[in-house]
């Protein structure tokens, strides 16, 4: 039996540190791949056979925000259904494709629609796109979502910079560890990178776009939360609630991606108002917020790209 920190165990088992394995070019591993990485490698090979593009920033678009990708300088697009073994979104407002192109001079890959745990996928499937974008070459992951406002000071249409998170869904790291991506027990103390948050915060200030900042909590869905559940998550310290994002941030952090995230407060959570919640309301609010969202994301991505070495 091997004892010691996970990184030392990995070094003794394989002759490679987790960082060496993680930073190695796709397809260069000579020892046995984990099943997770083997599947990921097949998706990557399918991508490379169709698309010749290496992004610097990966962007995930949430409910009602997907049209942002149509406004960038597009070089190529790839439907999820064209990638063998890749999960496909079934939710309205999620187109289900990768868009490759430029935001300013920054090379980006955009997920125009994500998959969710509540759709019946395994958590490994839910975070597969995040891991694939890491293999594509992305160094930064910019997560967006439509979320319910838990903080009484928030209003529908606000933007919230995610400072931290609470994940009430199963961890995407449960089960076999993909040593090729990261260590068994990754640190999460800076899961939303402080330096990247500073960039987005300063960008919003210069653009005169109001920006809240708070804690995001992921529940499983697909049902909206009960008033009692909202009281619970507020007690836990959450400012906004949704059904995605936190698991993606965990997988990204594990794989060595720097993460930043913004929630569009699409509605006030159950119990704050007497109005019933609907998915149509989420999309309607996101549509109204879209112009400012596009402005903030565009300028933030440009500055994030420039900040990379």
Enumerate the language-model features and the residues they cover:
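Short, low-complexity intrinsically disordered segments enriched in A/P/G/S/L with frequent Arg
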Residues: 9, 18-29
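Metabolite-binding pocket within alpha/beta catalytic cores that recognizes anionic/polar moieties
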Residues: 30-188
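Generic non-transmembrane alpha-helical segments
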Residues: 46, 50, 195, 199-210, ...
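Non-catalytic positions within long, well-ordered alpha-helices that form the structural scaffold/packing
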Residues: 134-135, 234, 253
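Metal-dependent peptidase/peptidase-like ectodomains
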Residues: 178-219
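Active-site/ligand-binding-proximal alpha/beta "capping" segment
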Residues: 206-239
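Zn-dependent metallopeptidase/amidohydrolase metal-coordination segment
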Residues: 243-281
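His/Asp/Glu-rich mid-to-C-terminal helical/loop segments that flank catalytic regions of hydrolases
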Residues: 270-309
């Amino acid at each position: 039996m091997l004892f010691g920190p996970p990184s030392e165990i990995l070094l003794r088992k394989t002759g490679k540190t987790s960082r060496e394995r993680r930073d190695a070019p796709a397809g260069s591993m000579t020892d046995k791949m984990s099943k997770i990485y083997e599947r990921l490698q097949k998706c990557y090979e399918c991508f490379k056979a169709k698309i010749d593009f290496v992004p610097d920033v990966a962007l995930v678009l949430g409910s009602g925000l997907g049209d942002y990708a149509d406004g960038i300088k597009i070089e190529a697009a790839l439907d999820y259904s064209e990638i063998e073994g890749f999960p496909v979104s079934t939710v309205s407002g999620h187109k289900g494709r990768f868009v490759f192109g430029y935001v300013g001079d920054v090379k980006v890959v955009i997920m125009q629609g994500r998959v969710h745990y509540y759709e019946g996928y395994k958590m490994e499937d839910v975070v597969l796109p995040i891991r694939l974008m890491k293999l594509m070459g992305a160094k930064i992951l910019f997560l967006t979502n439509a979320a319910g406002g838990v903080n009484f000071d928030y209003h529908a249409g606000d933007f919230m910079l995610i400072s931290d998170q609470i994940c009430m869904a199963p961890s995407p790291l449960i089960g076999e560890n993909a040593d090729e991506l990261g260590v068994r027990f990754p640190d999460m103390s800076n899961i939303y990178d402080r330096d990247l948050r500073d960039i987005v915060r300063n960008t919003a200030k210069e653009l005169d776009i109001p920006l809240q900042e708070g804690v995001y909590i992921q529940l499983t869905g697909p049902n909206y939360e009960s008033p009692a559940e909202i009281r619970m998550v507020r007690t836990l310290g959450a400012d906004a609630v949704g059904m995605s994002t936190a698991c993606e941030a965990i997988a990204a952090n594990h794989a060595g991606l720097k993460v930043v995230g913004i929630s569009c407060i699409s509605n006030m959570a159950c119990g704050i108002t007497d109005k019933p919640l609907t998915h149509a309301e989420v999309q309607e609010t996101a549509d109204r917020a879209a112009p400012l969202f596009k402005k903030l994301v565009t300028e933030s991505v440009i500055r994030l790209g420039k900040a990379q070495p």
